Amino acid sequence: SEMCIRDSLNPKAVFNDGTPIDIDALKATWQIQRDPDGEYKIAAAGIYEFIESVEAIDGDRYHARVVFKTAHNPVKGLLFGGILHPAMLDVNLFNEGFVDNPHPELGCGPFTLAPNGWNSSEKTFTAVPNDKWWGEKPKLDRIVVREMADAAARAAYKNGELDVVESRTLSAYNEMKDVANSEIRRGRRLFAGGMNLNAEHITDVAVRKAIFLGIDRGALAKIRFQGLPYEEEVPGSMLLLGSSQYYRDNYPARNPEEARKVLEKAGYTKSGDFYAKDGKTITLKLTTFGDDATTKGQAQTFIQSMKEIGINFELDSRAQSEFSKVVGNREYDVSISGFGVTSEPTSAAEYFYHSKNWNGVGTPEIDAMVDEMVTILDDAKRAEKCNEIEKKHMSEVCLFIPFLNGPDFKACRPKLANYGAFLFRSLDWSTVGWMA
C-alpha cells in the first residue's frame, strides 16, 4: 500500500546564505508542513501529511527517496513545489520571525531583496538580481513592489509611477482603457470568486443551506461583468474552470421557497421581515474589502436577496489593506472573496471539503470520500470523485459559494515584455524585461 517517489535536485542550487538545497531542505519542508495541528502555523498540510519518510538515496544528498504511507495522487505540482530553508525548522522563526523582516538570506531565485529594500512604513519591497542564483540571469535591474489601494494604484500608473496595474473591474477598466502609453492585456483569471461562509459564526447548517438556496448568483455575476468586454457562464465549482474536461456544475439550483422551508423546518419562525428562533432574529454581516462601486452593488443585491428569504444582513465594509487580517483570522460571517484555481482538482477538493481544514466542520462521510479520492490513480476517475465530493458538500455543509471566475485584465506599458495574463503558465521573473 506504500508509494515511493524519487526526487533529484540540482547540485548547483543554494539558498542565498550559501546553504545547499539538498536532502536537509527536503526533510525540513516535509517536517514543517506535515501536521496542520502541530507547532507550525500552516493553513493545511496538503500532500505532506501522507509522507512516511524522506531519505537520501545511497548517501547522495541530491537524490531523495520519498515514501508515502499510502498511495497519493497526483504528486507533480504538489510535492516540493516550494522548498524551505532548514533554518525554518525553528518554530519561532517560522511562526513569528518574518514579521517586518523578509529574511532574504533564507530564500533563493533570480531576484533577492535589495539593500534596505524593505520599507514597511512606505510599504515597498525592492528586489535586485541575485548573485547566488544558478539559473539564467534576469533581464531587469530592479523590481519595486508597492502596496496601494486600487484607486491610488491607478492614479500612480497614470502619473508614470507604476508600470502595471490591475484593471479587471468595470470602474478600473473604464479608467485605464484609454490611458496614453498603455495597453490592456487580457486573459481569464484563475479564480473561484464568490461568498465564503464562516461556520464558526454561522453554526446552524440550516442557515448556511438557506443562504446557498436563496442567493441569486447570476445577478451578482451580471453586476460584476456589466460593461466589461467579457462573458462567462456562472460557475458551479470551486475546483476547476468551466473549460476543463473534468468540470461539473455541482452547485444546487436556486430555490428561495425551499430556502424558507429549510429555515422553518429547523425551527425558525417569521417575525416581521426576518426569521427568528428562541427570540433571536437571524442577523449576519457581509464583509467586503475596498471601495469599488461594483463590489458595493453586489453587496446590496446580495443583502436584498437574503431579505427575500428572511435573513437579515448588514454591510461590513473594510479597507482593502485589512483583507489578510480579517480573512486570515476569520473575522467575518460572510465575505466576498475567493481562491485560486488550478488545472487539477485533487488538492482543492481536499482543502475545501475535508473537515480537518475547517476546525471539524464537515461530515465523516465526506472526509472518508476525500481520503479515498487521493488514492485513486486514474485522473478521470479521481476527478469524478472530486465532483461527487463537492456536490455533496455543497448540499450538506455549505461553506463556499462560487459565482464568478472573471477576467484577468492588466494595464501594462506596451514595451514591457513577458508580463500580463498567463492563465496556467507560471510567471518567470527572469524573462520579464523591456523591449527596445
PLM regions: where:
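Detector for C-terminal structural segments
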Residues: 124, 215-246, 294-303, 324-436
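Append "and occasionally in soluble cytosolic enzymes with long acidic Gly/Pro-rich linkers
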Residues: 128, 203-304, 388
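Ligand/substrate-recognition segments at binding pockets and active sites
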Residues: 122, 269-341
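Short, small-residue-biased leader/transition segments that mark boundaries at the very start
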Residues: 3-5, 127
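Gly/Pro-rich hinge or "lid" segments in bacterial periplasmic/extracellular proteins
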Residues: 80-138, 142, 152, 256-257, ...
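Ligand-site clamp/hinge motif
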Residues: 129-175, 303, 312-314, 319-320
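A structural "hinge/loop" feature
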Residues: 1, 19, 23, 74-86, ...
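Surface-exposed binding/hinge segments that line
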Residues: 6-8, 43-93
